């Protein structure tokens, strides 16, 4: 189901408790893909994550990488100012993933109390927002390493929010390929 309305900010809030497997701490990441009319990245600069923390005009900002969870209610945030999104960006995809050691079998089921909350705010200075979607990663996506949680689609001068809940067993690398990014 989708909904259309005028909102200033979308706040993507990834949370988890410190969790271990074989004495390794889990690191989760939230990211955003700013997509063109073909549903692809027009440039790798439109992939916002821990190594590229801001879009060109600061319309999308990744606030910092928490490497182990359990520090606060807001472990990792991406803040999207919809009023600043360039016109060539037709949709924004919100992703949660496990930052993993290559070859290891770490899945969301191993990470206690992991969730992704999506909130909206009508005031660009109010980061508390009103939650309208929550994904329980541990329970809903136990056998996955990454998910596309939400797609925000431009509809004229407004935005439409479409929950996706699409899982990827091989992690973020598969999502980057899915959106045409370079690895």
Predicted regions located by residue number:
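Intrinsic-disorder/low-complexity signal
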Residues: 1-183
């Amino acid at each position: 189901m989708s909904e259309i309305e005028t909102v200033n900010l979308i706040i993507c809030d990834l949370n988890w408790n410190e969790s271990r497997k074989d004495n390794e701490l889990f690191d989760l990441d939230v990211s955003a893909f700013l997509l063109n009319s073909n549903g692809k990245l027009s440039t790798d600069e439109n992939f916002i994550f821990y190594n590229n923390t801001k879009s060109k005009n600061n319309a999308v900002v990744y606030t910092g990488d928490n490497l182990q969870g359990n520090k606060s209610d807001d472990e990792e945030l991406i803040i999207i100012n919809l009023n600043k999104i360039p016109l060539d960006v037709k949709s924004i995809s919100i992703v949660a993933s496990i930052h993993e050691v290559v070859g290891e079998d770490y899945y969301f089921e191993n990470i206690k109390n992991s969730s992704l909350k999506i909130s909206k705010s009508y005031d660009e200075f109010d980061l508390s927002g009103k939650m309208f979607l929550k994904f329980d990663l541990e329970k809903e996506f136990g056998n996955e390493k990454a998910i596309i949680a939400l797609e925000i689609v431009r509809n004229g001068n407004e935005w439409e929010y479409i929950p996706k809940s699409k899982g990827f067993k091989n992690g973020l690398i598969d999502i980057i390929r899915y959106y045409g990014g370079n690895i």
